[in-house]
């Protein structure tokens, strides 16, 4: 079961595309948007990650990261190739994905396409899951959640 609004987001540490450790609790005091996507180099994932780079989300204190099971090397090449501006986090064994309850039940080696907005105090302010991995996420509720947080 996916994490719910009002829950404290589980803290985690994952490696970025540059092999740097990225820890959720290091960003307390900022709103954090966690964008789970199934795989680097796939059309919908590319479109979403490029869109968020071209059209940043509202809120000056908002940190955006993408999360997938792909390796740091894949993330690095994909980010450079596509001009993606935000960090991409590698969750190759889906450990963090499972903590948030976002593993895909029909395809156990990938995550759902999902968005979790964590507020400045570390609480989940929004959680949205796309049931079809081929469908782009709905950005409206994400913008709305961030607008309420300020």
Predicted feature residues:
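Chalcogenol-based redox active-site neighborhoods
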Residues: 1-150
């Amino acid at each position: 079961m996916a994490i719910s609004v009002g829950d404290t987001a589980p803290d985690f540490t994952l490696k970025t595309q540059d092999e740097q450790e990225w820890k959720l609790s290091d960003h307390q005091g900022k709103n954090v948007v966690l964008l789970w996507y199934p795989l680097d180099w796939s059309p919908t994932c590319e479109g979403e990650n490029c869109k968020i780079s071209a059209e940043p989300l509202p809120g000056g204190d908002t940190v955006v990261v993408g999360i997938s099971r792909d390796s740091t090397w894949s993330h690095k090449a994909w980010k450079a190739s596509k001009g993606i501006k935000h960090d991409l986090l590698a969750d190759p064994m889906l450990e963090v994905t499972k903590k948030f309850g976002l593993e895909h039940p029909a395809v156990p080696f990938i995550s759902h396409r999902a968005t979790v907005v964590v507020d400045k105090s570390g609480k989940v302010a929004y959680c949205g899951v796309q049931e079809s991995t081929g469908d782009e996420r709905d950005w409206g509720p994400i913008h709305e959640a961030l607008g309420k947080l300020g």
